[in-house]
Each structure stands twice: as structure tokens, then as C-alpha cells.
From Swiss-Prot:
Residues bound to ATP: 12-19
Chain's role: Catalyzes the specific phosphorylation of 1,6-anhydro-N-acetylmuramic acid (anhMurNAc) with the simultaneous cleavage of the 1,6-anhydro ring, generating MurNAc-6-P. Is required for the utilization of anhMurNAc either imported from the medium or derived from its own cell wall murein, and thus plays a role in cell wall recycling.
Biological or metabolic pathway of the protein: Amino-sugar metabolism; 1,6-anhydro-N-acetylmuramate degradation; Cell wall biogenesis; peptidoglycan recycling
Any Pfam family matching the protein: AnmK
Protein name from the UniProt record: Anhydro-N-acetylmuramic acid kinase
Paired cysteines (S-S): none
Top-level taxon of origin: Bacteria
Catalytic activity: 1,6-anhydro-N-acetyl-beta-muramate + ATP + H2O = N-acetyl-D-muramate 6-phosphate + ADP + H(+)
InterPro entries in UniProt: Anhydro_N_Ac-Mur_kinase, ATPase_NBD
């Protein structure tokens, strides 16, 4: 069974950077050694945002974006190797999620698409890459998402305590770690995505630091109720979503009914939307004793306070409190999934994704010997 140093690379729906994590992984433990966040150039970020909102590209433009993202991921890996004084031979493999540009797991021809050419990463780092993690699960009737609950279960499940892990990235997703029950998990809806999109358009800021804008505003209850009427929120699990659905266009359609509102009030309402949709799903799933939050949303003081208020009797903490960096959780998960793929072990959980069976995930792009 393969063990040793692995690197995980994650560029999520929030597009706030490329997260790269170095870890030692074997069948007994996952030990994080180092991490860094690598910036995404504004031009690349905008190109991804455009395609996620349905802007048409030529095949040439799409191919260039795929190559540019692959090079970006390779640069991020090489920066971490240099920082840690490591060589390619010191790493077993890279687990690279890729950049999701479309996710449509239902319908006549279900599909998901993550780009960032893994061949570029192999060529520029000299390290074997495991990528394309989601499509095997979709081929078996699943949603291909979320995949991280399997990792949450391996690291954070407790024999007697009802726990849930909440990742608040661009999209928020919940892992249900309930003793005596199959692991559950699904996307609850928007996490930081709509908040980030709004303040970017209104103030040119990538995110609402310390929730300053949201805390200066007031929740617009009619707007909140209008957004909560979206059918996604009442869909049963398994379910997954992404930027192709919850994007700035979605927000604009709801705002048409509310002209002239204060931008800070909209920011406050979007924060409340995230908190309410998450807390409702926690309660519908039977509640928990401890809710452990990871992802960028864990640094949003307003979100954390609202979750605690909406979930009385639940201890709301970040995963940092149990020794796992919330900022690095997803990248670490894909390093772990790469290890499982090379070990020939399944990486999905049918109880989470809805797939017909467990399966080894991903495609292997081997480095030259």
C-alpha cells in the first residue's frame, strides 16, 4: 500500500486562491506538514467566473484556460516544494481536484467538469498526479459530490457524539457523522459565493472582511423569504450544486423585486441566507451536539454567531479547535483521496453521493520513472 508524502491541490468555487497542502499519509494517520495559498490572477479568475455563468467560449479559449490553470496549479506545487526544500522524488503523488466550471449531476446526460490540465502538472513538477475524482461516481448514478464527507468521517467521527462537519466555501456542504448511522452529506446551498459576488460588484473587494459590510446592514426579510423559496433548498438529499446555479445572475433575478435597496442590507441578507439554509438542514437531519466548521466561512464572525444563535444546544466551533486547519481541509482531503486511489481503495460514499456502489475514484497521470 502506497504511503509517504502526498500533496493536495484545491481550487474551490470561492476562487480565493489555490490551496496546496503537504501531508504524510498511510493507513493509520494523516499528518499535515505544511501548506500555502497561491494567488489566482484576476484574468484567470474572471474567465472562470464567466464560464460558470454560461458565457460561451470557443474551443481554443477553453483549451487555453485548461492549460493556464494546469500551469497555475503546477506553479503552486513547485512553490511549496521550494519552500520545504523538497524534490519531486520526495513526493508519492499529487491529488488535484481541478477547477469546477460546470456541475450538472442530473438529467439525460449527467456530467461534471473540472479543468486544469493534469498533464501540465506532471510535466512541470515531475510528480505523478491523481485527478478527475468526480466523474466515476457520476457514471455510477451518483452526484460526484460531495466527496469530502468520507475524509471527515475518517478523521473526525466519534463513537458516541453526534457530530457534523460544515465546510463553508463558495458552496456550503454538510457531513453527517452520526453514531450508528451511515455517513451522510450534501450541499446545503450558497456559502460565501453570493456574499463574495455582491461585495465584488459593489465595492471591488474580494470578500467581506470580518463581515464589516454585513454587520453594518440590516436583513431585508421579504428578500430573504424570496430567496428561501428557491426549490433547491427543499430538495431531499442526495443533492449538490455549484456556481453554475447560485451565481450573480441568480441574485440579480431576486433583486429585481427590490429596487433601491442599501447594498449593505443586501450583504446582511445574503449572510443570513447562508446561516438559515445551513441551520435548517442541520435541524432537519436530526441536529448534532457539535458542529465543526471549516473553509473560509469559519473566519466570518457574523456567520459563526448566527449559526450558534440558530442552533441552541449545539457547540459551534471550527475544525482548528480539534487540530485540523479549516483553511486546508479540502486540499488535505484530496491528498488523502489520491492515496486511496493509488492504494486501490474506494473514495466515494454511496450514502452521500447516491452512487450505486463504492468505487476507486480518479485517473492517474504517472510521472516518468
Amino acid at each position: 500500500m502506497k504511503s509517504g508524502r502526498f500533496i493536495g491541490v484545491m481550487s474551490g468555487t470561492s476562487l480565493d486562491g489555490v490551496d496546496v497542502v503537504l501531508a504524510t499519509i498511510d493507513e493509520h494517520r494523516v499528518a499535515q506538514l505544511a501548506s500555502l495559498s497561491w494567488p489566482i490572477p484576476v484574468s484567470l479568475k474572471q474567465a472562470v467566473l464567466d464560464i460558470c455563468q454560461g458565457q460561451q467560449l470557443t474551443l481554443s479559449q477553453f483549451g487555453q484556460l485548461d492549460t493556464q490553470l494546469g500551469r497555475l496549479f503546477a506553479d503552486a506545487v513547485n512553490a511549496l516544494l521550494k519552500e520545504q526544500n523538497l524534490q519531486a522524488r520526495d513526493i508519492v503523488a499529487i491529488g488535484c481536484h481541478g477547477q469546477t466550471v460546470w456541475h450538472e449531476p442530473t438529467g439525460v446526460a449527467p456530467h461534471t467538469l473540472q479543468i486544469g490540465d493534469n498533464n501540465q502538472i506532471v510535466a512541470r513538477t515531475g510528480i505523478t498526479v491523481v485527478g478527475d475524482f468526480r466523474r466515476r461516481d457520476i457514471a455510477l448514478g451518483g452526484h460526484g459530490a460531495p466527496l469530502v464527507p468520507a475524509f471527515h468521517h475518517a478523521l473526525l467521527a466519534h463513537p458516541t457524539e453526534r457530530r457534523m462537519v460544515l465546510n463553508i466555501g463558495g458552496i456550503a456542504n454538510l457531513s453527517l457523522l452520526i453514531p450508528g448511522q451511515p455517513v451522510g452529506g450534501y450541499d446545503t446551498g450558497p456559502g460565501n459565493m453570493l456574499m463574495d459576488a455582491w461585495i465584488w460588484r459593489q465595492a471591488g473587494k474580494p470578500y467581506d472582511k470580518d463581515a464589516e459590510w454585513a454587520r453594518a446592514g440590516k436583513v431585508i426579510l421579504p428578500l430573504l423569504q424570496n430567496m428561501l423559496s428557491d426549490p433547491y433548498f427543499s430538495q431531499p438529499a442526495p443533492k449538490s450544486t455549484g456556481r453554475e446555479y447560485f451565481n450573480y445572475g441568480w441574485l440579480e433575478r431576486h433583486l429585481r423585486h427590490f429596487p433601491g435597496v442599501d447594498p449593505r442590507d443586501v450583504q446582511a441578507t445574503l449572510a443570513e441566507l447562508t446561516a438559515v439554509t445551513i441551520s435548517e438542514q442541520v435541524l432537519l437531519s436530526g441536529g448534532c451536539e457539535r458542529l465543526m466548521v471549516c473553509g473560509g466561512g469559519g473566519r466570518n464572525p457574523l456567520l459563526m454567531a448566527r449559526l450558534a444563535a440558530l442552533l441552541p444546544g449545539t457547540e459551534v466551533t471550527t475544525t482548528d479547535a480539534v487540530g485540523i486547519s479549516g483553511d486546508d481541509m479540502e486540499a488535505l482531503a484530496f491528498a488523502w483521496l489520491a492515496w486511496r486511489t493509488l492504494a486501490g481503495l474506494p473514495g466515494n460514499l454511496p450514502s452521500v453521493t447516491g452512487a450505486s456502489q463504492e468505487t476507486v475514484l480518479g485517473a492517474i497521470f504517472p510521472a516518468n520513472p
